[in-house]
Amino acid sequence: MVKMSKKVAVGLSGGVDSSVAAYLLKEKGYDLIGITMKVSCDLDVSEDAKKVADKLGIPYYVIDLTEEFKNKVIDNFAEEYLQGRTPNPCAVCNKHIKFGALIQKAKELGADYIATGHYARIEEHNGRFLVLNAKDDKKDQTYMFYSLTQDVLKHILMPCGEYTKDQIREIAKKIGLEVHNKKESMDICFIPDNDHGKYIKGLECRDRIKPGNFVDKDGKILGTHKGLIYYTIGQRKGLGLSLGKPGFVIDINPERNEVVIGDEEEIFNEGLIAKEVNFIPFDSLENPMEVEAKIRYSTTKSKATIIPYDDGKIKVMFKDKQRAITKGQRVVFYIQDMLVGGGTIESIVK
């Protein structure tokens, strides 16, 4: 349990969740400071966040992490697409920025802990910090926290995890926060129009975007694609092909600059290999384990077995074939409401 005398830096985004998180902690008597991370010259949420800090009567700081965000998140985002993978920038940001660089900056301001408005619960059991599903299943964000280590988890508070979204909005309205009915942001924060292709074309790496061939699984040329960054596994729309039947992206080959097209049944696979794996309740996987797994943020959990593999990687075998397992995305594991861990999808087991 956190001692009330400890200083807590609350990450204020200007939205309702982080604002109410700050209010809930202030009501419990914590010594708070509000901080907003600046990650883009074009993205400024500090005005709403400053209003919330003033309303709650807490000190407020803007932390400039623009350079760190570019180096860790944006560059990785572009490189993954250029390599034919589909990145998850939010997972990268959580690991390196929100719960990496931001924690370090908060410590420099004298804070012992950082709090956010995320929907997840962190509890200590027998000296180990566990991540549990939020009370609001529809808003649960635990998928994004699989990579957090024990050293990081012990410094994080997530009060919104004990409430539903409707309850959070009601609290905000009750205490007079202007953001109580603010619309949620669903897109990638640094790509507000959700057009990642246009965004990457505006970066220095634009010259690496090259047209290439659409091919079938036998290598027969079907047409010309605009560049690997525009395609992802399972994609059907926007291919510009006339095949006489529906065609789906079943593979992307960066070495040959080819996008492989096939039938829908070919995007269903039974397993995957994951790298960069992290576990939360324990340090490493020694034996096969039955879990429920998610291969992207928006999917439901599916029964699977995780198996130790070479070089710290793991094999994940699903009870039922999964649609569009995608390299670069994250696979995350659960046992009931406990987050077990996860990793980056490296390859597909067919």
From Swiss-Prot:
Catalytic reaction annotation: S-sulfanyl-L-cysteinyl-[protein] + uridine(34) in tRNA + AH2 + ATP = 2-thiouridine(34) in tRNA + L-cysteinyl-[protein] + A + AMP + diphosphate + H(+)
What domain of life? Bacteria
* Pfam name, any one: tRNA_Me_trans_M
Q: Where is the active site?
A: C93 (nucleophile), C189 (cysteine persulfide intermediate)
EC number per UniProt: 2.8.1.13
* Entries under SUPFAM superfamilies matching the protein: Adenine nucleotide alpha hydrolases-like
Binding of ATP, residues: G11, L12, S13, G14, G15, V16, D17, S18, M37, G117
Instruction: List locations, semicolon-separated.
Output: Cytoplasm
Main function:
Catalyzes the 2-thiolation of uridine at the wobble position (U34) of tRNA, leading to the formation of s(2)U34.
Q: What is this protein called?
A: tRNA-specific 2-thiouridylase MnmA
Task: Report the source organism.
Answer: Clostridium novyi (strain NT)
| Gene transcribed to yield this protein | mnmA
